Amino acid sequence: TRHKSTKGQEKMEAHKIIITGAATRMGAAIAKKLSGPDIEIVIHYNKSKASAENLKKKLTKNKTKVYLVKGDLSKENDLKKIITFAKSKLKYFDCLINNASLFENDNLKNFTSKSWNQHLDVNLKAPAYLTKEFAKNIRGKNNNIINIIDQRVFKLTPFFFSYTLSKTGLYTLT
């Protein structure tokens, strides 16, 4: 659900939020935008520990409760760890933002099984798994799942083959 902010922009009413890939770039920008008093955010990161810690310091200054969790989204045990951690801190969830993604260039002629599997695991399987677990830990009816995709889903090219296929799958999941 949404309400109007003082500047006339719509803001989410979610207070207990999980954001994957939130330590840098778009994920960090999303966390900053949603932060504020009475907001709790679980920030997932994989390799960007320093950035995650820096973001936590910034968000804490505006009274956001921030919890950091490291995890490799291509590993099912790490996905379970992220959900267990988030549940222990938040108790229940209002919003899941599947932002993290793997973005490596390949094409039909040079893709490898390893790259294919990594892209599908991080960009499609992890969001599907987290969505399933999110649904088990909600309260009420006003909950949000936001899956971040990009223009490559609609403007197909032969480049970033594995990425594009995984994000097209995520679009279908959405």
Kindly label every feature range from the protein language model.
Residues 39-53:
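Conserved glycine-rich Rossmann-like NAD(P)H-binding loop of the short-chain dehydrogenase/reductase
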Residues 15, 92-93, 137-151:
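Active-site loop of short-chain dehydrogenase/reductase
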Residues 99-104:
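Conserved NAD(P)H cofactor-binding loop of Rossmann-fold oxidoreductase domains
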Residues 23-24:
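Conserved glycine-rich cofactor-binding loop
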